[in-house]
Amino acid sequence: MKTDYEFLKTDIDGHILTVTINRPERMNALHPPAHAEFDEVWNEFDKDENLWVGIVTGEGDRAFSAGNDLKFQAEAGGKMDINMASSGFAGLTSRFNLTKPLIAAVNGVSMGGGFEIALACDLIVASTNAKFALPEPKVGLAALAGGMQRLPRQIGMKNALGMMLTGRHVSAEEGKSLGFVNEVVEPENLLSAAKAWAKQIEECSPMSIRATKQVAYENFNEPDLEKSMKAHYSAVKELFGLSLIHISEPTRLSLI
């Protein structure tokens, strides 16, 4: 994977990829060139068999991401491209076929599209100074990058509407209470805490993890348990269809 991105920083530690939004002067808000870089990064992450877990965070402690770069939009004459890459905001929010787990390490502001990036991840680790919101209705917009769909699925309709209809800011601790934050840590411990989660995942079979994620997501809204358990899943078929397995460490399976 290349490392010379203009608006992102990438780091690889073992099987873990960390992607940092590197626009602190814009509160890590995203504009079209940043979206394009994200799309490229996640494409590479998806196809690289040596990368098993991803972490996304923001440079500095002020913001994970303030969402859409409204200043850039104003400078461009007010045009807003809602038809970005098919993979969505940050190349992620409409990327529904990614079976590798992603962790959002949220530092500071996570607003609008920034919150939607975090919601598109599988786990959220937040610093004590993190603030979450979908404030689009306050400025006559709507959370079009999956926020209106993902938040009710993750915390229930009443809790989600309580956030979405008011645009109110939610602290990391309240986010944990509501159920969309997995862990709250001090700002100086944020990245190490996210990496600790990633390391635990890394200790598992990557193919088992992918199968688990696929089944969990594809059956989230399936009310028929029997139908869910009898369904066919490509990642499960791949996992149990192996003809040659090498056990290199306890509980870890890898292809030869």
Residue spans of the language-model regions?
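Glycine- (often His-adjacent) and acidic-residue-rich active-site loop
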Residues: K2, G58-N97, V139-G140, F220-P223
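Short, active-site-adjacent cap segments at secondary-structure transitions
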Residues: D61-S65, M111, A133, A216
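CoA-thioester-processing core
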Residues: F89-T99, A105, M111-L165, A193, ...
